[in-house]
A protein has these predicted regions:
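Acidic/polar, solvent-exposed loop/turn segments
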Residues: 1-550
Length: 550
């Protein structure tokens, strides 16, 4: 017969509790073969017989302070029809006999120690020497003579006590788990300001995932662990490889040693996951930057991504006599651990050289009459000066590339410059407008191209090429200059910085609003011939040879 400690009254966590059990009267009586004899029937009675006092029962109390939970020995003492098992002033069970029927009842009062920690439902038996505890049947005939017989109840495991183990389970409602680190760290070369080197799943949030119970044996301990299934487990994350077109490097794989899981690739450690086995707190520590595939967002995040059950956080509940039970939550399949990107920085230098490029119409190719020594149909914003306008940084993901472009807002954009029209009183012709095709912006009017602006996308050098002369309104100065003049932001030079995993950032300087590109005039030339004169002015080609007063 057995009782089971999984009782609500004892704090049991199981559902199979049994508070009392009996050796039935029928079974007890069937152990014997009495006869009254010639004097006829008198009576039959039953009793328990315990030899001695404070008799060791082979059972023990539970002591949470002891490593294996084994407490004081439970001893037996008898008073009348009741034998009580007790230790340290606490009663653990009773054996009671009905003296008339022989029924014996085992009543469980408190839980006892069970040494088998591999089975939370194991049983231990009351264990005494042969003949120490017996059940006695006494037969009395009609004139009072009596005889007795006994069966042993202590040496054969008659009375058993089944264990109650702890319960480990998940809470019905629990806070979500999440930890995010950010690569924008000085230690990683990051340029952002929101870097996060480590993040945790707090002990409180971890513990709130579970609903443990120690059961009837009382509190032992609760511990936590990470469980990774396999070695070199693909994490769904990648290293950064500047040599790859999209920057995606080798797969980062996971391996566990004790309480630490490390994500690594090619001999480089990228992050660790560490658990505090006492509290359950899990810390994600970022050691190096990982690849992010979204090139449209320099602050996107990627998640550690594993199959269901590959990475779990385990809570193990151990009761006072060493039985344990475990429950687990998944940490790999739900985007719990995230890694935010660091993008490049594009900005302007605090101090930079001024930008300017001037061409001069006093060119033979344009019929110029001037003799400017430095006349040229081409002028450049040098690569060095252009690059000095900016202050780029690649950030934690490392160097990708730097490129340059011209950006013109709109089409047929008024340049502030004009063609020359000899038919107009002041020579001002049609407005020269700007249009862009690729790396070239062309200024044209009436089907005639007057100049081009061309950028070298690799170096940033911008070349102004003069194709035809433009109108100059200052008639008092034959060598005056006019500037390309646009609204702020209409024509800009853009530097685009791209890091190793494809994120990009841009900065720009204005080229249209600050007189960067200038066009110097060519004036007429006066020749003295026979007391008279003639003049030539490229801005008035119809008047290339006019007589003037002698």
């Amino acid at each position: 017969m057995f009782v089971d400690e999984s009782l609500v009254s004892l704090g049991g966590a199981g559902t199979d509790g049994v508070a009392s059990a009996s050796l039935s009267a029928a079974d007890v009586q069937a152990q014997f073969n009495p006869a009254f004899g010639a004097d006829g029937a008198g009576s039959i009675g039953y009793s328990l017989a315990l030899t001695g006092s404070n008799v060791a029962s082979g059972l023990y109390a539970v002591d949470p302070a002891v490593a294996n939970g084994q407490g004081a020995a439970i001893v037996l003492n008898q008073v009348g029809n009741v034998i009580t098992g007790s230790a340290g002033g606490v009663d653990y069970f009773t054996l009671t006999i009905n003296p008339i029927t022989g029924e014996v009842t085992l009543a469980l009062l408190d839980n006892v120690w069970h040494g088998d920690t591999t089975n939370a439902d194991d049983s231990v038996a009351l264990t005494l020497g042969q003949g120490v505890l017996t059940l006695v049947q006494t037969v009395t005939d009609a004139d009072g003579d009596s005889a007795s017989a006994a069966v042993d109840l202590g040496a054969n495991g008659v009375f058993r006590f089944e264990d109650d183990g702890p319960r480990a389970g998940l809470a019905v409602e629990a806070p979500s788990l999440g930890a995010t680190v950010d690569e924008s760290l000085v230690s990683l070369g990051g340029v952002g300001t929101d870097g996060v080197a480590s993040a945790t799943l707090s002990a409180a949030n971890v513990q709130a995932q579970f609903n443990p119970a120690f059961g009837a044996d009382g509190a032992g301990s609760i511990g936590y662990s990470l469980a990774l299934t396999g070695s070199n487990v693909a994490s769904g994350l990648y290293a950064v490889d500047p040599a790859a077109a999209n920057g995606q490097g080798a797969a980062i794989v996971l391996n566990q040693v004790g309480n630490v899981i490390t994500g690594s690739a090619g001999g480089v450690d990228y992050f660790t996951l560490t658990i505090n086995p006492s509290t359950g707190e899990v810390t994600l520590a970022l050691l190096d930057n990982v690849w992010h595939g979204d090139t449209t967002n320099a602050d996107d995040s990627v998640a550690l991504t594993l199959g269901q059950g590959v990475l779990t956080l385990v809570q193990t509940v151990t009761d006072a006599d060493g039985d344990s039970a475990s429950a687990a939550v998944d940490l790999g399949a739900n985007g719990v651990f995230r890694f935010e990107d660091d993008g490049p920085r594009a900005g302007l230098a605090v101090e930079a050289p001024s930008l300017g490029a001037s061409v001069d119409e006093s060119l033979v190719s344009l019929g110029g009459a001037g003799s400017d020594v430095y006349s040229s149909d081409r002028a450049s914003l040098s690569a060095a000066n252009v690059q000095a306008q900016f202050n780029p940084a690649f950030g934690a993901d490392g160097a990708g590339s730097i490129g340059y472009s011209l950006a013109l807002t709109g089409s047929n954009v008024a340049s502030g410059l004009y063609a020359v029209d000899p038919a107009a009183a002041n020579g001002q012709g049609a407005a020269i407008v700007l249009n862009q095709v690729g790396n070239v912006i062309t200024g044209s009017a009436g089907g005639v191209d007057y100049f081009t602006l061309t950028i070298n996308p690799s170096t940033g050098e911008v070349t102004l090429a003069l194709l035809d002369n433009v109108w100059h309104g200052d008639t008092t100065n034959a060598d005056d200059s006019v500037a390309l003049t646009l609204g702020q932001g209409v024509l800009i030079l853009v530097q685009t910085v791209t890091d190793a995993d494809g994120d990009s950032a841009s900065a720009a300087v204005d080229l249209g609003a600050n007189g960067v590109f200038r066009f110097e005039d060519d004036g007429p030339e006066r020749d003295h011939q026979r007391g008279g004169g003639r003049w030539h002015h490229p801005d008035h080609p119809g008047c290339a040879d006019h007589r003037v007063g002698q």
